């Protein structure tokens, strides 16, 4: 997911997407402990997508405060 796509999302969509990705990350981490993953790099991309989403959320919080 690119930053431009993320910035186009509404605030509630950002929150929903973060929750969805965190659930997927949890499931993949759990499965990686018990079996080999088909796409081990998916964990990295999910982690980075979560970071991008949270960065945009924080930028919006700071912009709302007037910083």
From Swiss-Prot:
NCBIfam families: L29. GO terms for biological process: translation. Transmembrane segments: none annotated. PANTHER family: 60S RIBOSOMAL PROTEIN L35/50S RIBOSOMAL PROTEIN L29, LARGE RIBOSOMAL SUBUNIT PROTEIN UL29C. GO terms for molecular function: structural constituent of ribosome. Disulfide bonds: none annotated. InterPro entries: Ribosomal_protein_uL29, Ribosomal_uL29, Ribosomal_uL29_sf. It comes from Gemmatimonas aurantiaca (strain DSM 14586 / JCM 11422 / NBRC 100505 / T-27). The gene is rpmC. This is Large ribosomal subunit protein uL29. Pfam families: Ribosomal_L29 (PF00831). Keywords: Ribonucleoprotein, Ribosomal protein.
